[in-house]
């Protein structure tokens, strides 16, 4: 996915998702335009 920033971390942008997908170990997220930014801290 596309890199994105969330609370000072670099995360992955997921298009057209309301929440981060399970199984990737994400524990931080930020709402983004038409999607969400998910971060593994």
UniProtKB/Swiss-Prot annotation:
The keyword Secreted applies. Gene3D superfamilies: Anthopleurin-A. Keywords: Disulfide bond, Ion channel impairing toxin, Nematocyst, Proton-gated sodium channel impairing toxin, Secreted, Toxin. It is found in: Secreted; Nematocyst. GO terms for cellular component: extracellular region; nematocyst. One of its GO terms (molecular function) is ion channel inhibitor activity. The keyword Nucleotide-binding does not apply. Belongs to the sea anemone type 3 (BDS) potassium channel toxin family. Weakly and reversibly inhibits rat homomeric ASIC1 (isoform ASIC1a) (IC(50)=4.95 uM), and ASIC3 (IC(50)=17 uM). ASIC1a current inhibition and ASIC3 transient current inhibition are not complete, and reach a maximum of 70% inhibition and 80%, respectively. This is Pi-stichotoxin-Hcr5c. The lineage of its organism: Eukaryota, Metazoa, Cnidaria, Anthozoa, Hexacorallia.
């Amino acid at each position: 996915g596309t890199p994105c920033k969330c609370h000072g971390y670099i995360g992955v942008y997921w298009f057209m998702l309301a929440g981060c997908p399970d199984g990737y170990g994400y524990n931080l997220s930020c709402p983004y335009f038409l999607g969400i930014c998910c971060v593994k801290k």
